[in-house]
A protein has these predicted regions:
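Specificity-determining recognition surfaces
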Residues: 89-92
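DNA polymerase processivity clamps
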Residues: 1-83, 96-201
Length: 201
């Protein structure tokens, strides 16, 4: 799974969540009406089961009972065991990231291009080649190679260079996003993906 645990935070500005699998950090914004001053650690597998049993439009009341968190609404109750321990300050971490350049593009186009080059099945790495207003996805093997370009809009800096990423992790991240995305390359060739409600690092 992408995440092992999720830090669920009820803040003064609404519901927030953060998680990491050691290679990728994800933050997301939820309902702005769910305010408070509580931070909880929940197994990602438990939240995954809950999401499979409901839809985005469903609304729940949330409470804690000892070492468990309970989500409930009419004729439905779901309980998950809370995890102990602290969590990294993701706001501070994300705020420290400085992108060398950023571009605006469409998640659907990125998914289609990535799927196209991975169809040759030559491994688990994909190269992202930035050429100003174009982003080219590339994969290569001993006897075969594939590339798929998409149009991007340069926002900051000068998009240029080749960057290699884990294809499986990139596929997983893109599946969870939709609409337009601000894609950036930070220090050390780190990839950042930012949408209106989520941030992937």
């Amino acid at each position: 799974p992408l995440l092992k645990c999720v830090n669920l935070m009820f803040t003064s500005t609404g519901l927030r969540a953060a998680g990491s699998n050691g290679n990728c950090i994800v933050t997301a914004r939820g309902d702005n009406q769910s305010t408070g001053d509580v931070s909880l650690l929940i197994p990602a597998a438990s939240l995954g089961k809950l999401s499979n049993m409901c839809q985005d439009k469903d609304e729940f009341r949330v409470g804690t009972t000892g070492k468990s968190i309970v989500f409930f609404r009419e004729n439905f109750l779901f309980s998950a065991r809370l995890m102990e321990g602290g969590y990294i300050d993701t706001d501070q971490l994300v705020g420290s990231i400085r992108n060398a350049f950023t571009v605006l593009t469409d998640i659907h186009d990125m998914r289609a291009a990535l799927s196209s080059v991975l169809s040759i099945g030559t491994g688990n790495r994909v190269k992202l080649n930035f050429q100003d207003q174009r982003l080219v996805f590339q994969c290569a093997g001993d006897c075969v190679s594939a590339s798929a370009p998409i149009e991007v809009i340069a926002l900051t800096g000068t998009p240029a260079g080749d960057y290699w990423f884990n294809a499986k992790q990139l596929v997983t991240c893109l599946k969870a996003l939709s609409g337009t995305v601000t894609l950036g390359i930070a220090q050390g060739g780190m990839l950042t993906l930012a949408t209106q409600d989520a941030y992937y690092l």
